Amino acid sequence: MTKSYCAKLWNHQYIHMSGSFRLCCATMDNVEDSNGNRLHINNNSLENTWNSDQIKDIRLKMINGESVSSCSKCVEQESRGYKSMRESQDMEKNFALTKQDGSVDVMPTTMELHFGNLCNLKCKMCGQQYSNQIGKELLEIGKNDKDFLNWIYKESGNVNIWTNNLSVEYKC
């Protein structure tokens, strides 16, 4: 396995609850077009996003063993001795499917699509991005600790408020 390989770029598509395409659930970075505009499900097809310039560039970087900044969470996990999501088989098969420009003719075999964070549970392994109940709890803690609240907003990406009135920012 090359140090930067992740099978998700060959078999998985992730759509954040904001409607933005991302490489996977472990990154906060949105997939963007060549002008730096994020690709959104309302304006972009799955097919075009799957072989967008950014995705093709990242696939080629992975084939060449170059680091990908969007994948820093998994790299950090691995450096601590944990197995990350990107550690997977099929590297040679996926590399063989990749054209010289980084595109592939096969579509993803899995998709993760989130419509919001409305959830009546507060599972310990989850976060405010996926549970408004956890979000309400964190907002309560943040009333007395503004630094904590600023950190939570930064970590949550596009989610503004985690109350029963879900507010998600849609920037197209």
What residue spans do the PLM features occupy?
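Accessory C-terminal segments flanking Radical SAM cores
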Residues: M1-E92, A96, M107-T110, Q133
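Conserved alpha-helical substructure of the radical SAM core
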Residues: V31-R38, E78-C172
